[in-house]
Amino acid sequence: MSVLPGPSKLDFIPWDFTSEDHVQRAYLQRFACGWRWWELDDWVKANKAGKMMVYWLVLTDEVPDREAQVATHIARYPKESLPLTDTAPQSWLNTPRTPTNRPLNPIGHVALTLQSPQDLIPVGLDPGSTKAASIGKLYVSYALQSHGYGGLAMRAVETIAETQLGCDMCILDTIVEEFQMRRDVMERWYTAGGNPLPKISNQAWYIKMGYEIFHKDEKGYLHTHADDGSQEYLPVAYFRKMLR
């Protein structure tokens, strides 16, 4: 599915929450990301209720070396070597769609979630004057970062939020910069898993994308560490961006 005007390097293919193959691939990518892989059951429930949509990020023919990039991704993550099939039977708000049944090799994913008043009030937003969608679950293969795919995905889901869902704001959250960029945190989250260190923090990157911080919570996430299963509360910054 093309979202932005003009040729695009990414297609955004709906995740089929009814497919064991799609659910398992999402688990593999979340585990590779190192972040909230244990939430897949919640993803299925939210998608089934029409409140959330997950999109696979799939390279298009606009990428000159598409096959080589897919091969690079698979070499890094061999469990993803078999292509999925576009089988999602619905899109937003349970709207029926006709799947293409074409093979696809997703190199990441991103999600949009419609926010209810109960979601907005705790972070200080007025549900009476704001219709918001939350952007989350953004993941681009560590083997293919620095190609601009993350920024492209953000612009696309912002467009979907505004044009298809009628939202005037996108919100998101991430770990605060001071925590993420600590040496011990980067060693545990990136180096130990064989992944490159981030060039900038998530916080700085979202600000670069036009978002502003409006709320912080020192115990925003209860995170389960992939290496030993221990849990820790993490400090979180909440961001917003007006779409119109």
Model-derived regions: residue spans:
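Conserved catalytic-core motifs of GNAT/GCN5-like acyltransferases
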Residues: 173, 187-228
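A conserved beta-strand-loop-helix scaffold within acyl/acetyltransferase catalytic domains
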Residues: 98-99, 110-128
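Conserved acetyl-CoA binding element of GNAT-fold acetyltransferases
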Residues: 126-142, 173
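Conserved acetyl-CoA-binding loop-helix of GNAT-fold acetyltransferases
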Residues: 140, 146-160
